[in-house]
Amino acid sequence: MIEPSRIRSLLLSLLISLAALSQGSDSLIVQQMREEGVKFSHNNSVVLLTTGQEKFDDMFAAIDRARSSVHLEYFNFRNDSIADCLFDLLAKKASEGVKVRALFDGFGNDSNNRPLKKKHLRALRERGIEIYEFDPVQFPWVNHVFHRDHRKIVVIDGNVAYTGGMNVADYYIKGTEVVGSWRDMHCRIEGQEVNTLQAIFIKIWNKVTRQNVHGAEYYRGNDSLDYFDNLKPDTCKSAGNKMVGIINREPRTSNKIIRSFYTKAINASKDSIKLINPYLTLNRTLKKALRNAVKRGVKVEVMVSTHSDIPLTPDCVFYNVHKLMKQGVIVWMYQPGFHHTKVIMVDGKFCTVGSANLNARSLRFDYEENAIIVDKETTLQLSNLFDKDKADSFRLTSETWNKFRTPCQKFVGWFAHLLAPWL
């Protein structure tokens, strides 16, 4: 005989499950992420910037109109021609009385082949640019491997913000000899969530510099934005009314927020998932979520590159996507260059653009930031770009897999996947 309390508990669980099934994936992800502390606002515009040229043209145009402050937070500024153009523009704005603050990661700087050196930093400071290094790498190095600042945030006058996957480097426009063209994604946000991105920047700026930057002047008010009329417009009907939430991963504070979002987004899917990520080393939870989505009848498409900028990690990626392919995931292998984009689209209803990779560094260690965009029109724009890139990709099958990877390479992939928790 089942006790009445047990029956009530079972009925309640059933009702909750039925309610979840009837709830759209977009409203479900908003509800679940709000429970984890993510705030959403409804008054945003979002413009996708789909190439390096488009990103830098738009961002430079916005900086050129700045009146009060320009804040930049990047993993690295590669010391090349695009950085020279940026620093010249920032110095010009500083001479006009605009507060210019720039932050870069010490490991990110040292790990690129054209780092900013002390003499460069001195010269920039002499030109009025406040620039600081987050956690400089020093002997014995080990303590500085983890908890890097991998975010890419720019906020101008507290009214316009940029975020996504691109740092500052020529190769986002010109590509490289090793990987060819460099494909990536950025976006410009206007609206309430600019305040969230500004708060993220100011918090880490004050931590690094031990300053006390604060005040209403750094946050979006009711001022006219007419002086930013030179930027690429948001052509969606939903412009100015898009729901956006910012996921901010801080070590020891919000450790699980990025993996939680991706897991919940995949689990909430009912019809389709389109995913691009350059370092798809994944963890067990995400692999299971993707498998279960396929079992539910969700069309799951994943795109990764045949080229990469680092060793070993791509071998792990290829091993993973081959396993996923055998489990029913449609895998596209992008060929023209390196797809460094970090996006997911779910059910055509919501998407994310940001800095987070799906590897151990982003999910377990680094400072990261992604924008959740709950808007069908923006998601459709991103989805159309995904479909366009399929024309430059081949679909992974048993036959194409054997042509793509030699037995030796397959073994390296198997070995690399054992190292996934550290890649």
Task: Describe the predicted segments one by one.
Residues S9-A19:
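Bacterial N-terminal signal peptides
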Residues A20-L423:
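Charged, low-complexity intrinsically disordered terminal segments
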Residues M1-L11:
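Bacterial N-terminal signal peptides that target proteins for export
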